[in-house]
Amino acid sequence: MNMLVTMLINTTLSFVLILIAFWLPQLNIYTEKANPYECGFDPMSSARLPFSMKFFLVAITFLLFDLEIALLLPMPWAMQTQDIKTMTLTAFILLSVLALGLAYEWTQKGLEWTE
């Protein structure tokens, strides 16, 4: 009986919220609210906008460094192991690769936005 009452309340509340969601937006329609927002671009214009290659390279570099940092996330669980030297060596190698990659990008001016 208790489960039936709970399901009835949940179903009723869901239907009431759905009806409110469909009824409420029709009260005040503005032209600005009706237009979709596309990150500052006009959605009716051409989709072939010029794309900054520098932005693309910085975005790819960010993704690569983000994936390398994700390799370090299991380290707290690895600290529970009996072989602490292997875990420390692995963490040091991962951080070294990350630091070397950052130094390489810095020397090649891959992180500079303006040239």
Curated annotation (Swiss-Prot):
Reactions performed catalytically: a ubiquinone + NADH + 5 H(+)(in) = a ubiquinol + NAD(+) + 4 H(+)(out)
Topology versus the membrane: Multi-pass membrane protein
The entry's keywords: Electron transport, Membrane, Mitochondrion, Mitochondrion inner membrane, NAD, Respiratory chain, Translocase, Transmembrane, Transmembrane helix, Transport, Ubiquinone
This protein's GO CC annotations: mitochondrial inner membrane; NADH dehydrogenase complex
Residues in coiled coil: none
Gene Ontology terms for molecular function: NADH dehydrogenase (ubiquinone) activity
Localization of this protein: Mitochondrion inner membrane
Transmembrane segments: 4-24, 55-75, 86-106
Short name of one Pfam family: Oxidored_q4
Gene Ontology BP annotations: mitochondrial electron transport, NADH to ubiquinone
Signal peptide range in chain numbering: none
Enzyme Commission number, as recorded: 7.1.1.2
Keyword NAD appears in the UniProt entry: yes
Nucleotide-binding is among the record's keywords: no
PANTHER family listed in its UniProt record: NADH-UBIQUINONE OXIDOREDUCTASE CHAIN 3
Similarity field: Belongs to the complex I subunit 3 family.
Subunit structure: Core subunit of respiratory chain NADH dehydrogenase (Complex I) which is composed of 45 different subunits. Interacts with TMEM186. Interacts with TMEM242.
Function in brief: Core subunit of the mitochondrial membrane respiratory chain NADH dehydrogenase (Complex I) which catalyzes electron transfer from NADH through the respiratory chain, using ubiquinone as an electron acceptor. Essential for the catalytic activity of complex I.
Name the record gives this protein: NADH-ubiquinone oxidoreductase chain 3
Organism field: Nelsonia neotomodon
Chain's gene name: MT-ND3
